From Swiss-Prot:
Assigned protein family: Belongs to the sulfur carrier protein TusA family.
Protein name, UniProt field: Putative sulfur carrier protein Ta1170/Ta1414
Annotated active site: 16 (cysteine persulfide intermediate)
Pfam family, any one: TusA
Length: 78
C-alpha cells in the first residue's frame, strides 16, 4: 500500500457491527481526500466494510490480510 492513512481505527477484538460503525463515524468526521484505515480481527468486517464503502460512493483503496487481522483502507471522495 503506497497511500498513508490520515486516520487509523484500531478495532481489533471488536465484533460486527462495531468496526463498521467506527469506520462510518470516522468517515463523517473526515474531509474529502482523507484516507481512513480500519484494523479488524472480525471476518465479517472484511466483507461488510468494502460493501459499505462502495455503496456510499467512496473509494476502496484496498483490503489487506495482515498478520492476524484485516486492514480495510478507504478514501473519502465526496
Amino acid at each position: 500500500m503506497d497511500v498513508k492513512p490520515d486516520r487509523v481505527i484500531d478495532a481489533r477484538g471488536s465484533y460486527c457491527p462495531g468496526p463498521l460503525m467506527e469506520l462510518i463515524k470516522a468517515y463523517k468526521q473526515a474531509k474529502v481526500g482523507e484516507v481512513i484505515s480500519v484494523y479488524s480481527t472480525d471476518a465479517g468486517t472484511k466483507k461488510d466494510a468494502p460493501a459499505w464503502i462502495q455503496k456510499s460512493g467512496q473509494e476502496l483503496v484496498g483490503v489487506f490480510d495482515r498478520n492476524g487481522y484485516y486492514e480495510i483502507v478507504m478514501k473519502k471522495v465526496k
